[in-house]
């Protein structure tokens, strides 16, 4: 038997006879492990490959059913209809062809399924063949142009008119931020949902709102974490507050989606959840204060500045806590409650939250002579500019403190603030002493603060101007946006002008009209793009439309995060979606049921249902990721958010195209 063995086998047997049993056993175990790895890899490869024929067989079965229907009637329109069904993965088409029992409450919708498939859009000047040969580029450019138009009309006209309305009605900042200002930031999504229900007769509105929600949670937070100038510490209360409401709203939405239809009372329940959030925001400060008093580690600490201590050259306890070398622009883990509605109500995308990142440390910033005439946005930008000056001057102040010693004189300036605290600001001086406020030690040159605030007033709070810019890049941008801005400037009064302030109703209703027109064109051209390249409106809503309508939120959140306001950026990303889920979706549904004699709305889309479930799962992953990053917005958190967003897009598209089958069937 030894004669028939190969030389390699004889050499191995000889080596094992001379080596210790352990050496031979190690060699045998390594071969065994390699064999196990190969088997596992083979099984995984078979599983991955098996998904392809399963998906192909599903499409083949669908096509065979449609082909059998075509064989009975080979007329031209029937063939064209079958061709549309193969290129557009629209669930309504498939239900029309082979679903045996449509919902009884939607009989009128089933009779007009052809119109619902195409939507109530005007006839395109380009045929499908011409669009496939290159004319679709014009539709893509027009769709992007509508993204810019929606951002401009909301930014320059709609939100300022809402600010005037809240001031006229005397609504508190918290309630205004959760109602009027939330509507201003989410107007594109709301009108897209209305168009999807009444004009497109598709789920494009649901896809846009769900995709926008994931974009705000994952992509926006990821961008804020990557582009912030420093690692930002986050606090738990704003995130806990908004996530709690958002989880309840998502669970309600998932439950209502289970039977493929939305009843009128289900829409009403979602709207009721929104009003509950508004009521909570009315008492947000009191609730937060009570909750943190119940939790010993987060007790609210009130810091007061004695008059004598503030003016004393040697004021300050050397053993007491001092401010870090660079003042933080967000709340730390042990900081007190910092809610200030003026800080929150200034930027329209962030109007749902009440956060004053420096109320504990800085109190208020000084009442300027033009403070009462400024809009909420101008007040925020003014304060943000002062904060920026404080951060820039801190290092110089510390150096002057060590070299020059005591201050000659301290000037007290009182400013309006919900916390009713005071701040000491020192005028310009070569030798100055810092004012110490518990853990605060700041020295600000008085000459710089007016300059900063005047600059913020001049640049950010001025009415819209159509003057020709001097910079070449700005001139090119001006030419691009001029066809949008000029009609708005002609038809809508700018309420930021004192003389036009009384015309705020015209601006309000006119802005709504323009938003409706821009949203209609955006959805129409997105439908044409999807029809040309062969994807459904639901996928367009989940991807392109969701990102396009959320660009203003992205830009504002990144700017706020770069200023150091990490809490405001993160909590707004979660809280801004509450309006979309509890108003943007149920309001069009409720209007539809009322108009159609309380008949339910069909939302039969297995891909979108799983997308909503994925949205809920991604929200849990966001909370877990923030906790694992120790409540800090760093680069790792940013890359995690980007990875989760990519996974959501891929899985959602595969589910909507039936390449993957949702494990939860409806």
Curated annotation (Swiss-Prot):
GO MF terms held by the record: calcium channel activity; calcium, potassium:sodium antiporter activity; symporter activity
Membrane topology: Multi-pass membrane protein
TM region(s), chain numbering: 39-59, 134-154, 180-200, 206-226, 238-258, 261-281, 503-523, 539-559, 575-595, 608-628, 636-656
GO CC, alphabetical: membrane; plasma membrane; postsynapse; presynapse
Subcellular location: Cell membrane
Region annotated Disordered, chain positions: 63-122, 311-336, 397-467
Repeat positions for Alpha-: 175-215, 546-577
GO BP annotations, alphabetical order: calcium ion import across plasma membrane; calcium ion transport; cellular response to high light intensity; cone photoresponse recovery; establishment of localization in cell; intracellular calcium ion homeostasis; learning; long-term synaptic depression
Protein name, entry field: Sodium/potassium/calcium exchanger 2
Taxonomic lineage from the root: Eukaryota, Metazoa, Chordata, Craniata, Vertebrata
């Amino acid at each position: 038997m030894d004669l028939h063995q190969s030389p390699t086998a004889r050499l191995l047997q000889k080596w094992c006879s001379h080596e210790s049993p352990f050496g031979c056993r190690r060699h045998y175990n390594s071969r065994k492990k390699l064999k196990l790895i190969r088997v596992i890899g083979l099984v995984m490869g078979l599983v991955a490959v098996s998904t392809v024929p399963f998906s192909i067989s599903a499409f083949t079965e669908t096509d065979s059913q449609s082909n059998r229907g075509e064989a009975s009637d080979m007329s031209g329109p029937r063939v064209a209809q079958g061709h549309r069904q193969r290129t557009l993965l629209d669930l309504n088409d498939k239900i029309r062809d082979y679903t045996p029992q449509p919902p009884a409450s939607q009989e009128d919708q089933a009779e007009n399924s052809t119109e619902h498939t195409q939507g109530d859009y005007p006839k395109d000047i380009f045929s499908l063949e011409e669009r496939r040969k290159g004319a679709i580029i014009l539709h893509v450019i027009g769709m992007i142009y509508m993204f810019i138009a929606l951002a401009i009309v909301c930014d320059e006209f709609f939100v300022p008119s809402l600010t005037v309305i809240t001031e006229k009605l005397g609504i508190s900042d918290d309630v205004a931020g959760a109602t009027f200002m939330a509507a201003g930031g989410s107007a594109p999504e709301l009108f897209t949902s209305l168009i999807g229900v009444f004009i497109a007769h598709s789920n494009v509105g649901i896809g846009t709102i769900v995709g926008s929600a994931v974009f705000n949670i994952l992509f926006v937070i990821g961008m804020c974490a990557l582009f912030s100038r420093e690692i930002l510490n986050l606090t738990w209360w704003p995130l806990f507050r908004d996530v709690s409401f958002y989880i309840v709203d998502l669970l309600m939405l998932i439950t209502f989606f289970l039977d493929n239809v939305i009843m009128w009372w289900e829409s009403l329940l979602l709207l009721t959840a929104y009003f509950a959030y508004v009521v909570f925001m009315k008492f947000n400060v009191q609730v937060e204060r009570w909750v943190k008093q119940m939790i010993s580690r987060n007790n609210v600490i009130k810091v007061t500045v004695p008059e004598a201590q503030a003016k004393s050259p040697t004021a300050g306890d050397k053993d007491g806590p001092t401010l870090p070398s660079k003042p933080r622009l967000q709340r730390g883990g042990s900081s007190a409650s910092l809610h200030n509605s003026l800080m929150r109500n200034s930027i329209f995308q962030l109007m749902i939250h009440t956060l004053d990142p420096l109320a504990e440390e800085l109190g208020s910033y000084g009442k300027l002579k033009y403070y009462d005439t400024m809009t909420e946005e101008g007040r925020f930008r003014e304060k943000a500019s002062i904060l920026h000056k404080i951060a820039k001057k801190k290092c110089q102040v510390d150096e002057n403190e060590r070299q020059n010693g005591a201050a000659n004189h301290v000037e007290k300036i009182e400013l309006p603030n919900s916390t009713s605290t005071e701040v000491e600001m020192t005028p310009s001086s070569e030798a100055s002493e810092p004012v110490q406020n518990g853990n605060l030690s700041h020295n600000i040159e008085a000459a710089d603060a007016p300059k900063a605030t005047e600059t913020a007033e001049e640049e950010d709070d001025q009415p819209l101007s159509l003057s020709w810019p001097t910079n070449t890049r700005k001139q090119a941008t001006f030419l691009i946006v001029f066809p949008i801005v000029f009609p708005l400037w002609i038809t809508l009064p700018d309420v930021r002008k004192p003389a036009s302030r009384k015309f705020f109703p015209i601006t309000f209703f006119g802005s709504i009209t323009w938003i409706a027109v821009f949203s209609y064109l955006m959805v129409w051209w997105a439908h044409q793009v999807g029809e040309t390249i062969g994807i459904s409106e639901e996928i367009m809503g989940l991807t392109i439309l969701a990102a396009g309508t959320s660009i203003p939120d992205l830009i504002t959140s990144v700017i706020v995060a770069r200023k150091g306001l990490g809490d405001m950026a993160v909590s707004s990303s979660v809280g801004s979606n509450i309006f979309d889920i509890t108003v943007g979706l149920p309001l069009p549904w409720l209007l539809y049921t009322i108009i159609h004699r309380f008949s339910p709305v069909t939302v039969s889309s297995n891909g979108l249902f799983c997308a909503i479930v994925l949205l809920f799962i991604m929200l849990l992953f966001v909370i877990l990721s923030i906790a694992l990053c120790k409540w800090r917005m760093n680069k790792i958190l940013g890359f995690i958010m980007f990875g989760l967003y990519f996974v959501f897009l891929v899985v959602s598209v595969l589910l909507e195209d039936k390449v993957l089958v949702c494990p939860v069937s409806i």
